[in-house]
Amino acid sequence: MSAIDGLPPLREVIARHDLRAKKQLGQNFLLDLNLTAKIARAAGDLTGCDVIEVGPGPGGLTRGLLAEGARHVLAIEKDARALPALAEIATAYPGRLEVIHGDALEIDPLAHLTPPIRIVANLPYNVGTELLIRWLTPAAWPPFWQSLTLMFQKEVAERIVAQPGGKAYGRLAVLAQWRTEARIVMTLPPEAFVPAPKVHSAVVHLTALPGPRYPADPAVLNRVVAAGFNQRRKMLRASLKGLHPEIEALLIQAGIAPTARAEEIGLEQFCALARGLAAAPR
């Protein structure tokens, strides 16, 4: 890709700008531009799309997104050390890359973007799950984004696509599968990164559905699954008792045995419970 965009290899960029990854920022840099291009392609045809990227670091994925035709990339970067490297990419792609220095958890990107919008990111490990839950649980749906193409630790990716009954099934699976079509599209070994993490990574592609699979208030559903899976080995009548004094009756009304555990309950039943809880007098 260096020959295409006229920019130097990422190892050279990192050395020149002293961009050693910081553990406290959850950084692991992907240096193979062939892999970053592959991740960009996993997001689909980016022509005519605005793209949000969180934690671009030295800009490997940023370059992939721009080379694959993204109309405009909004890169949100907390680490000030990366800004000069990203500015060089912006110069190579005039008018197509906007960099915001700040925390993605505190920034509203919508003022900077024009639909259609996609989110593509090698998320910092320490904020990835929190960002995903925010993107999955807005009050209004469809959301501002068409799709999410996100890299996580492989264990987290497997939790997003997990089915009831297994150890991986939990809050992420329920929230993701309620409103999106989610699938793992790539796995990457530790040695693909600098520094190499201790675990494999995976890219998950989530496409927003036109509407949720079953009706439920997102805040209530999030509260139900958070409580249920926070104490996943407990029976639901115990793990959810803090949500409502008549939780056993609400479970039965939703078709759920009060003695069941969260990992045994499917999406439809969780949504039924959330509806019942929202409608129940306190």
Swiss-Prot record:
Molecular function as annotated in GO: 16S rRNA (adenine(1518)-N(6)/adenine(1519)-N(6))-dimethyltransferase activity; RNA binding
Binding site for S-adenosyl-L-methionine: 28, 30, 55, 77, 103, 122
Gene Ontology CC annotations of this record: cytosol
Record's keyword terms, sorted: Cytoplasm, Methyltransferase, RNA-binding, rRNA processing, S-adenosyl-L-methionine, Transferase
Broad enzyme group: transferase
Catalytic reaction equation(s): adenosine(1518)/adenosine(1519) in 16S rRNA + 4 S-adenosyl-L-methionine = N(6)-dimethyladenosine(1518)/N(6)-dimethyladenosine(1519) in 16S rRNA + 4 S-adenosyl-L-homocysteine + 4 H(+)
Enzyme Commission designation: 2.1.1.182
Top-rank taxon: Bacteria
Gene3D superfamilies hit by this protein: Ribosomal RNA adenine dimethylase-like, domain 2, Vaccinia Virus protein VP39
Main location: cytoplasm
Pfam families registered for this protein in UniProt: RrnaAD
Compartments where found: Cytoplasm
Function noted in UniProt: Specifically dimethylates two adjacent adenosines (A1518 and A1519) in the loop of a conserved hairpin near the 3'-end of 16S rRNA in the 30S particle. May play a critical role in biogenesis of 30S subunits.
PANTHER family, alphabetized: DIMETHYLADENOSINE TRANSFERASE (PTHR11727), DIMETHYLADENOSINE TRANSFERASE-RELATED (PTHR11727:SF7)
Family: Belongs to the class I-like SAM-binding methyltransferase superfamily. rRNA adenine N(6)-methyltransferase family. RsmA subfamily.
Protein name: Ribosomal RNA small subunit methyltransferase A
Organism of this sequence: Paracoccus denitrificans (strain Pd 1222)
Lineage: Bacteria, Pseudomonadati, Pseudomonadota, Alphaproteobacteria, Rhodobacterales
Gene of this entry: rsmA
